[in-house]
Amino acid sequence: MNLVEWIVTIIMMTEFLLGNCANVFITIVNFIDCVKRRKISSADRIITAIAIFRIGLLWAMLTNWHSHVFTPDTDNLQMRVFGGITWAITNHFTTWLGTILSMFYLFKIANFSNSLFLHLKRKLDNVLLVIFLGSSLFLVAYLGMVNIKKIAWMSIHEGNVTTKSKLKHVTSITNMLLFSLINIVPFGISLNCVLLLIYSLSKHLKNMKFYGKGCQDQSTMVHIKALQTVVSFLLLYATYSSCVIISGWSLQNAPVFLFCVTIGSFYPAGHSCILIWGNQKLKQVFLLLLRQMRC
């Protein structure tokens, strides 16, 4: 390995370990709490599911990175297809569960008098379940694309050098275009959640100012915490999606590809750390664990 690959390896392994520790921590804490209380809140259920799928996403990204750094000349069709399917599934559920968490915060925290908003708020659990199940259509579409890519790769193995180059280029472009189109929907939903939360917060602050009350009330703090979680998800997800698209266009450019994979890996690792810090229960357990480790 050259110097760049060594640097990328160190950063990638740091993100991988950090992300796995954070997501395993979330899963274990919420599981223990569920066993003790014999119930689990909707928010904890969503966050736990996110953590589990992010562990899978991190492993899929690590495998992809490993194949380009250590075995770039190995052309194993089965491994490519398996890696593509694993990444597609974990990426899909990570993305949509993050979007559903944004919607959950919006409906639980925002205060609007709109009749449709109030109706959806009353049926929130059912609404989120329908969205989660409905999003599976996007997953089926993407897995269909992976299958088409498999057929293309089989043709590549049987074709000449020119055919190989053209088919690689076509499948890469098609894959990235489909990825972009599919991810517009959850990104748009999350963006709307951010804007509506900001509008709800500004309306609340105006009411507080009108009645001569301070701005540091409970509702304001809850709005701010929710915005921190949702905005961080949106920004990290946008960065991650951009890295996936750029890396898909730069498969032949190893430095660019490795850089994009490294930057993109911060999304499933970094946002989970933000979730821990923004959740009172997880934060308390984490701080308690740190104090015990220092003793």
Curated annotation (Swiss-Prot):
Topology class, membrane: Multi-pass membrane protein
Primary location: membrane
Electron transport among keywords: no
Cited Pfam families: TAS2R (PF05296)
Tagged with keyword Glycoprotein: yes
UniProt cross-references to InterPro entries, sorted A to Z: TAS2R
GO cellular component: membrane
Subcellular localization: Membrane
Keywords assigned: G-protein coupled receptor, Glycoprotein, Membrane, Receptor, Sensory transduction, Taste, Transducer, Transmembrane, Transmembrane helix
Residue ranges, Extracellular side: 1-5, 67-80, 149-177, 250-255
Molecular function in Gene Ontology: bitter taste receptor activity; G protein-coupled receptor activity
Bilayer-spanning residue ranges: 6-26, 46-66, 81-101, 128-148, 178-198, 229-249, 256-276
Cytoplasmic side: 27-45, 102-127, 199-228, 277-295
CDD domains, per database record: 7tm_TAS2R43-like
Positions annotated with a glycan in the UniProt record: N160
Note: Several bitter taste receptors are expressed in a single taste receptor cell.
Function: Putative taste receptor which may play a role in the perception of bitterness.
Stated family: Belongs to the G-protein coupled receptor T2R family.
The protein, known as: Taste receptor type 2 member 120
Organism: Mus musculus
Gene, per the UniProt record: Tas2r120
